[in-house]
Amino acid sequence: MVSERYAALMESTAEDMIAEAVRAGRCRLDDLALHYAVAVTAEVVGLTSSPVPAMSRRLTRFFRQPPFDLARPRLGRTKRQLMGAAYNGLSPVLRFYLADVLPAVRDHRRRPRNDVISQLLDQGAGRADILVECVTYGTAGMVTTREFISMACWHLLEDDPLRARYLAAGQDERLGILHEIIRLEPVVGHLYRRVRDHITVSDEGREHHLAPGDLVDIDVRGANADPASVGTAPLELCPGRTLPRGIGASGLSFGDGAHRCPGRSLALLETDALLTRLLAQEPTILAEPSLGWDELFAGYRLRGSELRLGSA
């Protein structure tokens, strides 16, 4: 169980970071969320041989990509854009490998631990396989969790009754509130998949035939706001809403089936561990966040929210 295995790690990391923010009297929310998500996930994975702030900066560079269109040849990019994408994609991976992954692998060979890297080494995985896993955890497990923490905190700070309910609730109810927030505000707005076999899907009585190689755009935000799936008032935040059988509380925000995000429980639990401690400090908003859009994972980006903590 994630809650049992990593609870102490999430709680101690959150307490340390909130204590540091309280001493400073203020914090920038997206930076706090990033460093916290990176610190927790790094421990889970085993990327513990480099400083968290430096690794955080390297991970955010993964997302510096020119626009693209999956339905067009060469992603709709010019030759110059393709060259820029290759450089922007490969150079951060190389830096991440040399500064974070390789030192961690060396340390784990000398001293195995109970984490992902040690498990991969036990299975005979090579450095390339370990790098792929670390990049996957680094982008999905760290950077996207940063966005959800920021969005969930913003919702709770803007809604006094919801914040009071959250702080007074037990963990199950708090997680229910977070499920509803991420249903309404999925971090990844679209999932793109290539069809592997001939399939037929129906939509409102109409059949659509899909052939191998066809590109399917799964509109996560739209699906999560479908009254047929999530009930009445789909665009309102209603924790504990009654859902049909087979529909999860977070909708498609963590995917589904074979591609369902394996880190969904960790993401929600670490968000809860940080927000309960942050909101207990009764933060005051000094600067509202700016809302942007990230084409790479078709999701929102919140930056610049400043919070005052304590009496500072």
Where are these regions (language model features)?
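Cytochrome P450
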Residues: 1-312
